[in-house]
Amino acid sequence: LLGALALGDIGKHFPDTDEKSQGISSIKLLREVAYLVNKKGYEVVNIDSIVAAEKPKLKPYIDEMRKQVSEALGIEIENISIKATTEEKLGFTGREEGIKSYAVVLLKKI
């Protein structure tokens, strides 16, 4: 969302050197980013995302994740896609050293 509006990266807005950023909820960060998007005169239309992780298996959590994102952004849950995948034991995610995600968003000028 920040990149779509050339607002810099997450570290610009929530630096890891700032104590307020330590341990902060990702949903709280998303709400604050949504505020910046709206302040810039845009709204989120939809999100299509993929989370790559060997473990944990995310399928049991997808519906709740969609609900949380929907509430944080103030958009319908039907407009949020979260898909889980593995990388078949390849790379750092395949070695269970981390998780990564990708997202494509559609924004509309309001």
Report each predicted region and the residues it spans.
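A generic structural signal for well-ordered coil/turn residues at beta-strand boundaries
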Residues: 45-47, 86, 99-101
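RNase III-family endoribonuclease catalytic core
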Residues: 1-64, 72-73
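Short glycine-rich loop/turn motifs that provide flexible caps or phosphate-binding loops at active sites
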Residues: 2, 7-10, 83, 90-93, ...
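C-terminal edge-of-domain segments
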Residues: 93-110
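Short, conserved loop-to-beta-strand elements that form functional interface hotspots
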Residues: 48-53, 63-93
